Amino acid sequence: LEPLLNSMGWYENKDFIRQLPIHAGRGHRIFPDYALHYDNKPDEEKAKVLIEAKLYMKNNQEIEEAFLQARSYACLLESTVIILCDKRCLIVYEKKDSFDRDRYKKYYWGELENTDIFNELKNKLNI
């Protein structure tokens, strides 16, 4: 994932941050895997793109669980894009009125060698 973000011109602690601490209630913090295009001002944390990274989501139930986790983080961060990624692919959800679990675009890692597909994904994240 990080080599992909780097190849799109985005770098850690400048454009994205890992494990951004977010206050989620009194004394409770959560740590999304990646926040892209972020502001880490305390108590006002924001990220335009929220990325939840898993090793391998082997079935629909695991994708659903990852989506629900990412959506809760995205709501707190006011994100407009969620990405679930694993060793096979990236699943991109774009917020319309809300995030719809059934409305997404899937990108397999090998497809991103195609310039058009790479640029399509980059444009979705360049917000």
Which ranges hold each PLM region?
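A short, conserved, highly charged catalytic patch centered on acidic carboxylates
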Residues: L1-V81, C89-I127
